[in-house]
Amino acid sequence: MLISNEWLKEYVTIDDSVSNLAERITRTGIEVDDLIDYTKDIKNLVVGFVKSKEKHPDADKLNVCQVDIGEDEPVQIVCGAPNVDAGQYVIVAKVGGRLPGGIKIKRAKLRGERSEGMICSLQEIGISSNYIPKSFESGIYVFSESQVPGTDALQALYLDDQVMEFDLTPNRADALSMIGTAYEVAALYNTKMTKPETTSNELELSANDELTVTIENEDKVPYYSARVVHNVTIEPSPIWMQARLIKAGIRPINNVVDISNYVLLEYGQPLHMFDQDAIGSQQIVVRQANEGEKMTTLDDTERELLTSDIVITNGQTPIALAGVMGGDFSEVKEHTSNIVIEGAIFDSVSIRHTSRRLNLRSESSSRFEKGIATEFVDEAVDRACYLLQTYANGKVLKDRVSSGELGAFITPIDITADKINRTIGFDLSQNDIVTIFNQLGFDTEINDDVITVQVPSRRKDITIKEDLIEEVARIYGYDDIPSTLPVFEKVTSGQLTDRQYKTRMVKEVLEGAGLDQAITYSLVSKEDATAFAMQQRQTIDLLMPMSEAHASLRQSLLPHLIEAASYNVARKNKDVKLFEIGNVFFANGEGELPDQVEYLSGILTGDYVVNQWQGKKETVDFYLAKGVVDRVSEKLNLEFSYRRADIDGLHPGRTAEILLENKVVGFIGELHPTLAADNDLKRTYVFELNFDALMAVSVGYINYQPIPIFPGMSRDIALEVDQNIPAADLLSTIHAHGGNILKDTLVFDVYQGEHLEKGKKSIAIRLNYLDTEETLTDERVSKVQAEIEAALIEQGAVIR
């Protein structure tokens, strides 16, 4: 189940981040398997208005568009989408923007015409083609409603959102709906849950005058109801509704079908919409299928039915396969005007057997299989009527046509506070226990020491006292249960934690690389407090410092490491290689405890190799310092990438940010010549890493890798590219297309000058191939090499 935070806020308001909410939900029994951020890797995406469109003079399939993006003048964008036209509101990625997949938007010339941006499809902003409306599958997205040019496109699309993906166990079917999840969140945060509007303005005409409902076997179909809505207008649903469906993994179709799916997600109650005029009669009969009976479902497939299947009929012919899929001739089409809305309870075993036999698993069948909340059946139908009235101009007929019995909305269970306390191992008052049940939306009655809990039908997992005890424990918070000292019969020796072990390994790696560990003061001068800080936040100053040099808590380890290097050089120890693992501190406002983050930093200056027996003398440079950092990443089984950066205090051309999973976790670079001279240092290189961030991502470490027993191959490639293209971008493309046999790459030559155009450079790269399972063949390597070269050419490189 995919839960949109933006949608969830409609029912329950909490003051907490989505990541904290996900953590809290996980700790109380529903695992949040993933957190999907639709804003990730997207930058400078705005709404644009296409003011004009002209054919490209030199390309039949391209159009030259003038697009208003909220700036002083329209921008010219060359677009190849077949559906682009003047008068449209579209998604525009501005120059300097980014799109998923690492795509950077730059000024370009396409067949001689200037293009300053990109008009985007939904696929290009990260939406799967499985969920995109069919009208936009092969072209750009066009807003169906007027927008303000220049506004944030993600906000206009309701995609500035984070979505939690639940990995639900079968017993928690209540969380297969937004309202069920809202009840859970309201309980966790002790707040109120607000239900959506369900009341329509009804006509005097009664649905009973137009329709009858009959159930032939109430053991298989305990309840079936229908409501009628006239004069609906079939059109696209509102953008916000389409966005919520897309984020939930459902493709928008039209407003009527979308409302059916929307209510399914909202209440967990599957609905079906029939074209009333196509049903063929004024009666609905729900029965078992006849032996050998056939029907054609919505996917244009003729199905042969068994007597165990439940069908919805018009008295004669099946018009739907109950709980699984509708029939083709009664489906909602573009010309549909009158709607019959079905809300029912079907036998879960029958639905499971039918859906599995026909391989027709759907959102509806999965919910029927797990059991439906009787309290929501009619409410969900009423909600659909309200939405059809609001967003399809429908006229709702009064009354509900139904057959069968809904059954009990609640199940009473008696329990005592003493029973709960004896089970969970600590004492809660009766009032505390009742409060927790009320938070969950369970009504309670108290008779002396007995608490009668009215469990609603949505919580089918609660049937006995022990289930109620579990609810008390998890909502109270497993982490908040008081700790008690256990009684040990024997004492076992302690051991290092995973983090302690990894920290020791990192220290050993750095010491093996020739660095010495330093331990410096946490206090620095106010001037140095924010030097090299990766987060620009308020400093923490001492009220009564012992000296100006120790007046604030540091936000970087480097100021004192630079001071230590300067101290050593001044005393004739000119070859300095130091590292430190220590805490830095960031303020959180008055009265709040600061954030304490562990960093790893290093400094290298002078000669790296100084003894004759170690080999040729080698002076510290950028790549040597980078090699030290890479040793750390390799030991922690992490993969760093590097991106050119400008950081105060560092050389503007010899500095890079260090990224882990596309997030900046540190930097490396040469100390700015002015700062180095002020400290009497020659060329000096520093690095700093957020050690906490590394520990949070690292899931293992490498102690040993077997020596390959099969020979590898190497291929060299020379590329001519624009001089402003970093080698890292080329390496990223190479690795993305190298498959599992490309083991590593090495830039061994960079050339600019004679025989190259101005603004161009030549980069020579060695590609090392290896298969640990078998000997590589030339054909296999050549095939991968060809794919890599094609990708590089597409990126703009020329193979030399």
UniProtKB/Swiss-Prot annotation:
Binding site for Mg(2+): 461, 467, 470-471
CDD domains linked to this entry: PheRS_beta_core, tRNA_bind_bactPheRS
Ranges where the FDX-ACB domain occurs: 708-800
Keyword Transit peptide (UniProt): no
Catalytic function, reaction form: tRNA(Phe) + L-phenylalanine + ATP = L-phenylalanyl-tRNA(Phe) + AMP + diphosphate + H(+)
Localization per record: Cytoplasm
Domain B5: from-to ranges: 408-483
A single MF term (Gene Ontology): tRNA binding
A Gene Ontology term for the protein's cellular component: phenylalanine-tRNA ligase complex
Signal peptide: none
Cofactor annotation comment: Binds 2 magnesium ions per tetramer.
Transmembrane portions of the chain: none
InterPro entries from the UniProt entry: aa-tRNA-synth_II/BPL/LPL, B3/B4_tRNA-bd, DNA-bd_dom_put_sf, Fdx_antiC-bd, Fdx_antiC-bd_sf, NA-bd_OB-fold, Phe-tRNA-ligase_IIc_bsu, Phe-tRNA-ligase_IIc_bsu_bact
Cell division keyword on record: no
Family: Belongs to the phenylalanyl-tRNA synthetase beta subunit family. Type 1 subfamily.
Cited NCBIfam families: pheT_bact, YtpR
Subunit structure: Tetramer of two alpha and two beta subunits.
The protein's name: Phenylalanine--tRNA ligase beta subunit
